Amino acid sequence: AWAGLSVESLDEEATPRERRQAYARDITYATAKEVAADWLRDRLAASRASPSRSVRTLAGMLAEGVALPGRSVTADRLVMRGLAHAIVDEADALLIDEAVTPLIIAGDSGEAADERRGAAFRAAATIASTLAEVDDFKVDHAIREVTLTPRGRRKVAAADVQGVPVLAGVRRREELVVQALSARALHEQGRHYLVNEGKIVIVDEFTGRLMSDRTWRDGFHQAVEAKEGVVVTRPKETLDSISFQRFFGMYRRLAGMSGTLSEARRELWSVYSLPVTMIPRHRPSRLRRLPLTAFVRGEDRWRAVVDAIVELNRVGRPVLVGTRSVEASEALSIRLDQVAIPHRVLNALRHREEAQVIAAAGVRGAVTVATNMAGRGTDIRLGTGVEELGGLHVIATELHESERVDRQLAGRAARQGEPGSVQVFVSLEDELFVRFASLEAAAAQRLARDGVVPPMVAKAVARVAQARAQALAKRRRSDVLQSDDQLRDSLGFAAKGR
C-alpha cells in the first residue's frame, strides 16, 4: 500500500480468483486488452445467468457495479466491480488509433476442422491464383477491398469444384475466392503476419508485436492459412465483442496522457468529452529535424539509408532506424551486413532480448534497426560521450498513416533536454502514397531530378496522404461507434437463444 491505497498488477496468466483480487484493490495496473476482456467475460456470465435481461441493461449494471441477481453469479463468475475510474497511458494510441479494434471473446464454432473445410479454402486459393488483377478483380488499396469484375465472376462460376461440396454454391464460392484474393493482394507475410511453427500469427500494426492469441474473423484467418500452405484451423464463433471506443466511453471518470495528444483534441472531445491540457516541457527541446528526403524508387531510399548509417557510425553516433514491418527490418539488416556495420535488430521475430537491445541502443557506435516495438514508451539512455557527438540520431524509413505515430518515433531522440536529431527517408512506392496519394505521387515523380523529389514537393504530398489516411480512419471510428450498439444487441439476442 502507498498513501493508504492498495495496489496490484494484473497479467494475462492470472486466474479468475487472482483477477477478482486485483480488481478489489483501490488501484489496478493492467493492459487495456486484459481489462476489456474481463469485462466481456463478466457480461457473458451475467447474460447466461439472467437471460431475461437485455444486454444493454446488463452492460449498464456491470459498468456501474450494481449487484446482479443470483448470488452464485456474483461470487463465482464475475471478477470486476464496475467501471469507475481509468487512467490511460499513451491515450491517443488506445482511444484514437486502436479505437476501432474489436476486442472479441470467441468460442468453438462447432464446425469441424475436417479435410473438406480445409479443401474448400485451398481450392479457393487455387482459383484465386488463376485470376488476373484489373481484368478479373480490382484492388482498392485505400479502403483495402477486393472486388471481382464481371469477367472474374464468370471465371469463378465456371471453375471446377468437383469434390469440394462447400464450394458447390456460386455465392459461397465467390466469398471464399474474394477472401483468398484479399489474403494474397492486401496481406503480406512479414508486415501483417508471420508464419511461426506452422501457424499464422498476426503482427500488431501499432506496436509491431506478435498477437499469438488473436485470429482474424469470418474465415479470413483460414484464407491466409490456405495461402501459406499451413494447416487450416477450425473457425471461431464470436460470443461477444466491443471496441475500445465503446468500452472506455462507459467509465464514469476517464483520463489519460501522451506526448502526442494535441492533434487529436477535437476527436477526444467529441467522442469522450475529454478536454486536452498541454503540460509545459521540463526542459527546452534540443531535437533537430532534418528535411524529408523522398525518392522515386524504394531501392534508392534504402541505399540512402545505409549511406547515412555508415556516415553516422563512422563518427560514433548511435542510430535508431525505424521500419514499418518485420520484412523491412530484416532486409535492412542484410544490407548492413553487406557493408560490415555491426547492428542489432528488434522486431516480432527477435523480441526475446528486447530489454538488452534498448539498453544498448544509446551507447557510442550502436546501430539499432527496429519496428514500432521501439516507438511509444521506449526510453533510450545515452552512453558516455554520446551527448558531445550530438546525441541519438533517429532514421524513419517510411511514414505512417498518422503523423502522431511518426512523432513518437522521432521522440526517442533528444529526451529530457538531451541533444538528438531525426531524419525521414521515403519512397513514392511506399504504401502510404500508393493508397492515399497516387495521383500526387505521379506528379511528384515528374518533378524529380536524378530520382530525388524536391523536399517541398515531397512534404506537400506526404501531408496530403496523411490527411486522407486520417480522414478515412476517423470515418471508420465514427461508423464503429454507430454500429457497436447494433452488434451488441444482436450478440445479446444470440446469447439469450443459446
What label would you give each PLM region?
Residues A1-G451, K459-R498:
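Conserved P-loop NTPase motor core
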